Every structure is written in structure tokens, then in C-alpha cells.
Amino acid sequence: MKFANLIFASILITYLLPDEYAQADVVNVAVAANFTDATRDIVPLFEKTTGYNVKVSFGSTGKLYSQIKNGAPFEVFLAADKKRPEKAEHEKLAIKGTRFTYAKGKLALWSANAMLFTNGEEYLKTGNFKRAAMANPKTAPYGLAAQQVMKHIGIWKALHSRLVQGENIAQTFQFVATHNAQVGFVALSQVKAWKGNKGSFWEIPQNYYAPIAQQAVLLKKGEKNPAAKAFLEFLKSAQVKTVISRYGYGVN
């Protein structure tokens, strides 16, 4: 009976303790889908270096931001743009002075078919495909960049009816990898990380779309969590910048 009471007391204490004491050794991080592979390399390095643990949730930047606004327990936000972290500051969901650019995203046109094209821009202009994949431009910064590229080339209206939209850039990549779309606009980092056939890809000139400055910020829920602050600082380290560069991102 005493043992049962002890268990009950322990559970009660866990629930009564403020979050920063109950899980002070854990940081809850929301990460844009395009940064999935890099994050999976970075997290073990962080945990080994600091002794803290990390819980990660991946998704489109727009959907993650909506979850943050609705009270999701995220403490750090790694977005695929700077718009949402700025909004988080403005709406008092994030701590001012903690926001910074951790990576500069690059867009690629990719096909799982190695023989599909040698000149990506010319291939897009021919329209010689049934389906092209892109992320939702309303919620995914890489989707917005894809839209900008097509408008720059002058093919947005012509291709609009043949575009299939992924909820995020990870789903967009899967559409192409599984041949549900012949070609797709994806993050260059995904092509770099892909373990299968590299296929055909075109690294799209960066003057074809607005810069993709991917920013991180400390959220209000992580203000008193040392693990959250440590994670953000770790992102700025030379060790992490090497990982980020390896996946095809630009770094400061």
C-alpha cells in the first residue's frame, strides 16, 4: 500500500511541477519539414554534447505556426522562412532578441528518373510531363519559392492544372520519389540526403525566387527551459554549420 501511495505521490508531483522543472532536461522543437534530415544528424550531436534530450515535430512552417498559436507545447521553432518567426515575436509567442537565420534554403527541380532531363528550365518549358509536384505555397515557403520560379520562367498559368501540391516539402518529395509525379520542386537538401537513385536534378538559380532565410526562435514556452536555450546556441556552433552545409544549405 505504501508503494502504491509513493507512485501516486510521484505522479502528482510531476503534474503539479511547472513545466520548466518537470521537463527541464528536455526541449520540444518544431522543425520545418525540409530540415528533417539535417535535424536527425544534429539532434544526436546535441544530446551527446549537452546531456539534454530533444523531442522533434516536423511539418510545414505554416501548419507548425498555427499549432504554436493554438497552444502546442513547442519551445523552439525552426521555420523555413523568417515571416513566421517574426510574426511569433510580434504576437508575443516568441522571445525578442533570440531570432536568427540558421540556414539559407535552396530550391531544386528533381525527378527520380535519371534520364528525364539535362536542362531543367528547358524541360519545364516543354511541359512534357503529366504531373509536377510542389509544396502548398500558402503554408510551405519552398512551395512559395516554386511558384515564384514558375512565374519567373513564365509557365505558372500553363502548368497550373498539372500541379499536385504536397502539404509540406517532405510529402512533395515523396510524390516524386514514388513516381506519382514525374518531376517536382523540392529542397536541394532532400536531393543531397536521398539514398536512392539521384535521378535528374537542376539546382535552380537563386535569383529566380526570393531568398529562403530559414530562421529559428525561442518560443515563450521555452523561456525558462535551459535545454531550449542550449539548443538554439548549439545551432550556431561551427560543428552544426558543417552539418547544415553538407545538406546543401547556405550558412552565415
PLM segments and residue spans:
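Bacterial N-terminal signal peptides
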Residues: 4-19
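Exported/periplasmic ABC-transporter solute-binding proteins
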Residues: 23-51, 55-58, 62-72, 79-82, ...
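Active-site phosphate-binding/coordination module
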Residues: 97
